[in-house]
């Protein structure tokens, strides 16, 4: 049913536009082979187990673009084969669709839908800092947004998103999240392009044994220092209410949240740093957490066909049971990942990556380490362009 919902959404905007002779329509099939060595596939702190993993991927990308509409459908199947732990072999599925439509010169509407089936224990590591079990997860997510230009200087924004994670055997890890966001930006008359920002957000998280409601308001600025350097800064209060399903006991907490994003772009080098603090929920933990994150990405082109990249991710997930959170948690996850990419031609490219990860449980005072290395070869060829 979830797969059909995603594909039905895509057909609603792709097929009618094709009949109307779109300005730009592309169909791009792709295939990839990834060979990986992982020295701690279960992220164990006392019984590390290594393995070689082969991942064969096949996918299809369909893109549609006209003066008023942008649409995309991306599908991919990954076949995972473990050299020693064959019981972990799996087929992972990914489906993603998006559509954006310019209703008039002032109003733009967009929608996204996604469905995936995955099982790797590190599937969320780069996003949340969490390590999961190898239980099969079925995820569906949907979002809708509207941008309205109220005047030459003022814009309004609103969005709604829904995420549902269901696991094949473990109910404890299941999670449903909903987010509502409204915002306003206004350009200011400064010498450099600057905009004031005001956002309000409501989030509802439904876990196995608890529910959490979080309310936040942030105010800040975005500013373009130069053609190469820009920043975004937001900060504001939040109020959190958590309740246990079994006892209906409710607790409350409050604090600050926000973000700082710096972006640098030039011809050969791009860099971005994002620092944020928020209350959020995700699958793999029975309760919300206060998450503080640092994400740094640096990319440099060293030749016409080659580039290097350095990624650093660090997430601290904290929760105190007496403060609107269901469990005690104090965990720091840090990863370092240098990589090299080479393009043989526009259709074929390869990537070599090393990734080191350390997870520190600051409650129990112990660490888990993992080294991962992989080489990936990708082929993509537009059959309709």
Model-derived features: positions:
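Cleavable N-terminal export/targeting peptides
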Residues: 1-26, 382-385
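Gram-negative and organellar
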Residues: 21-385
